Amino acid sequence: MFTLKKTLLLLYFLGTISISLCKQERDADEDDGRKMTEEEVKRSIITMTKEAKLPQSWKQIACRLYNTC
């Protein structure tokens, strides 16, 4: 019975320590994280579309599908 109590007590303390560490980490992330402005959102959307390198026409799509490029 005593070993069971020790084990449960140990698990309880390890759980509370891990929860407190997670909370500290989350609080640190919230301090750093600020709201993005509209301009930053627009910039990120533009850069994502530029990096995607989408085909400009149906000919390019067909070319890539059939490997005729």
Swiss-Prot record:
Query: Which keywords, in A-to-Z order, does the entry hold?
Result: Amphibian defense peptide, Antibiotic, Antimicrobial, Cleavage on pair of basic residues, Cytolysis, Disulfide bond, Hemolysis, Secreted, Signal
In which tissues or organs does this protein occur? Expressed by the skin glands.
State the Gene Ontology BP annotations.
Answer: defense response to bacterium; killing of cells of another organism
Predominant cellular place of this UniProt entry's protein: secreted
Q: Report if keyword Secreted is assigned.
A: yes
Any one GO cellular component localisation term in the record: extracellular region
**Signal peptide feature range:** 1-22
The coiled-coil regions, if any, are none
Propeptide residues, chain positions: 23-43
Pfam families recorded: FSAP_sig_propep
Q: Which family does it belong to?
A: Belongs to the frog skin active peptide (FSAP) family. Pleurain subfamily.
Q: What is this protein called?
A: Pleurain-A2
Which source organism?
Answer: Nidirana pleuraden
